[in-house]
């Protein structure tokens, strides 16, 4: 879970034994990543993916986490100084598997929880949807294609939708998108 307005970190606990929970990890682990994260509002979406590791494909349980809330990004005409980044984290170790940043038009923070979707019903997440503070909806393709053998090195993100610019206020996205 995230610290929300109290900080920029996420942490994981093993609560298999509810009488004796165990600390697992904290993210981020490096100052360079921490400098780019906003307040950790985003409740992670959890799912399985296939990734390439040492030339082999392995199954991983992951957390999908938005880059966080940047209070400066709420003002019309401004862009985020932090939080305009999206992560895929190994849920057992807290290690970052993938960082989506620097994409065209990815200039606003991601405080909302993402929605992970298994589009082909194979038990693995294929798409992750999340909104940003500019009213943009993003989709991150984290699928594995058995035919072309695409894996995490080919994962990509793109803007799916943008709220109309002619409106007086920005359309900040604070809530998890519903996907049907």
Would you name each region that the model predicts?
Residues 1-180:
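Extracytoplasmic/lumenal domain signature
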């Amino acid at each position: 879970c995230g610290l929300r307005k109290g900080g920029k970190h996420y942490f994981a606990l093993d609560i298999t034994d509810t009488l004796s929970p165990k600390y697992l990890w904290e993210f981020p682990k490096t100052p360079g990543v921490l400098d780019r994260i906003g307040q950790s509002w985003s409740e992670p979406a959890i799912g399985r993916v296939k990734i390439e590791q040492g030339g082999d494909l392995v199954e991983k349980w992951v957390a999908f986490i938005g880059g966080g809330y940047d209070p400066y990004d709420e003002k019309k005409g401004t862009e985020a100084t932090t939080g305009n980044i999206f992560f895929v984290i190994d849920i057992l170790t807290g290690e970052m598997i993938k960082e989506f940043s620097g994409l065209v038009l990815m200039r606003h923070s991601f405080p909302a929880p993402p929605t992970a979707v298994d589009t082909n019903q194979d038990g693995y997440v294929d798409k992750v949807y999340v909104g940003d503070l500019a009213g943009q909806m993003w989709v991150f393709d984290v699928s594995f294609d058995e035919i072309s053998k695409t894996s995490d090195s080919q994962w990509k993100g793109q803007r799916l939708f943008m709220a109309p610019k002619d409106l007086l206020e920005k359309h900040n996205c604070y809530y998890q998108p519903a996907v049907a």
